[in-house]
Design a protein with these regions (language model features):
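A domain-start/cap signature at the N-terminus of enzymes
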Residues: 17-55, 133-135, 140, 145-148, ...
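Active-site machinery of serine-nucleophile hydrolases
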Residues: 55, 59-113
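Primarily recognizes the serine-hydrolase "nucleophile elbow" in alpha/beta-hydrolase
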Residues: 117, 121-122, 128-172
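Acidic catalytic loop of the alpha/beta-hydrolase fold
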Residues: 183-188, 217-218
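Gly/Ser-rich "nucleophile elbow"/oxyanion-hole loop immediately N-terminal to the catalytic nucleophile
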Residues: 45-51, 100-137
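Short alpha-helix in the alpha/beta-hydrolase fold that links the catalytic acid
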Residues: 71-72, 188-198
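Catalytic histidine-centered segment of alpha/beta-hydrolase-like enzymes
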Residues: 214-222
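Short beta-strand/loop motif that positions the catalytic acidic residue
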Residues: 171, 177-180, 184
Length: 243
């Protein structure tokens, strides 16, 4: 009996952490530009009639480029697709991807934002609760998405990402909680600091968590931070933010 019990426990643990990918529906979007954008979409476990849900735009890092399992490259997807989290924070998760040589600072971001607008019309999404997050290249993409369409987002969580400080003025009104590892040598921590300081100078009030001793993998403590998720899903777009 003991081996059978152990096997059941292992299977339960495996299913709770690995089957999340099966719940993401992978498809593609033909943009107005005629470009094709591949993406994965996770819906709430139960969509109730007449109710609207948040949408989280989740951007992968460079390791997800040209990867057939790109949705696994952002830890946020795995965390939020767990049973308890899906129950606590029912939402739509949009996880697009770029080509092997692509970037979130390219025309691909225009296609992503166009897709978000289409989904807002098609699905029961609360337009005042559209969020964006991403790690590494996706962290930079988080800043980029907010800068290109600041009126769209209620909040953003860039993780170990940087962007042009010139964009700070565009996103200063958006609630932001950024994370960066103190010892990051891939996307140097100075880039994160510079962006936060620029946002503050532009009148913003971003939250910034610099993680002592942490290198590039700051997404692990960031996305396992329950306070962050509680904060993110409590944010709502206001007239001031969308003006």
């Amino acid at each position: 009996m003991r081996p059978a019990f152990i096997t059941c426990v292992i299977l339960l643990l495996f299913s709770s952490t690995e089957t999340f990918a099966e719940d993401f529906e992978k498809t593609e979007y033909k943009a107005d530009s005629a470009r094709t954008l591949q993406y994965a979409l996770l819906e709430p476990q139960k969509v109730e009639a007449g109710k609207k849900y948040p949408l989280l735009l989740s951007l992968h890092g460079a390791g997800g480029r040209g990867n057939k399992n790109w949705e696994r490259n952002c830890l946020a997807n795995k965390i939020l697709s767990g049973r308890e989290m899906r129950s606590q924070y029912p939402c739509f998760i949009l996880a697009p991807t770029v080509s092997k040589q692509g970037s979130w600072k390219s025309e691909s971001m225009d296609d992503v934002l166009e897709l978000v607008e289409k989904l807002l019309k098609k699905l029961p999404i609360d337009p005042d609760r559209v969020y964006v997050t991403g790690q590494s290249m996706g962290g930079g993409g988080t800043y980029e998405a907010m800068a290109r369409k600041p009126e769209l987002f209620a909040a953003g969580v860039p993780v170990c990402g940087g962007n042009k400080v010139e964009n700070a003025k565009k996103i200063a009104a958006i609630p932001i909680w950024a994370f960066h590892g103190e010892k990051d040598r891939v996307v140097h921590v100075e880039r994160g600091r510079e962006m936060i300081e620029a946002i503050k100078k532009a009148g913003g009030k971003p939250r910034y968590s610099e993680l002592p001793g942490v290198r590039h993998n700051s997404w692990t403590p960031a996305y396992k931070n329950q306070e962050m998720w509680k904060w993110l899903f409590s944010q709502k777009r206001t007239k001031t933010k969308s003006s």
